[in-house]
Amino acid sequence: MTKLHFDLVSPERLLISADVDQVDVPGSEGDFGVFAGHAPVMTTLRPGVLAIVNGGKAAEKFFVRGGFAEVTLQGLTVLAEEAMPLAELDGPTLDQRIKNAEEDVADAKDAAVRDRAQTTLNQLRELRGALG
């Protein structure tokens, strides 16, 4: 099987650059899989789990919080607003972040601050759901 070159980049670092069989991406219009030879496309991402597939099995999973995905003839590049390997996430720490975000929503003094806090809370809950 022809491999797909894949790069996952966050503002902090390059998380992965590898040749893989497939990448399942949480697109804003729905999840989609990318293989070598995929038609070129550019789309936005929603918060969710990005899975790298090798040998028919999910080899690595990352939580991505928004961003862009670009498929070209050379491969797939994901520029994520935030990305972290699911294997590195700690449940109790995440639960505390959710609790803090809930307090931020409750304490917000104006609509703009509340909306930002609610977006953060929703993303953290999405991440918690991805962890199971």
Where are the predicted features?
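Compact, glycine-rich, soluble single-domain proteins
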Residues: 5-100
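Short, charged, intrinsically disordered terminal tails
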Residues: 1-3
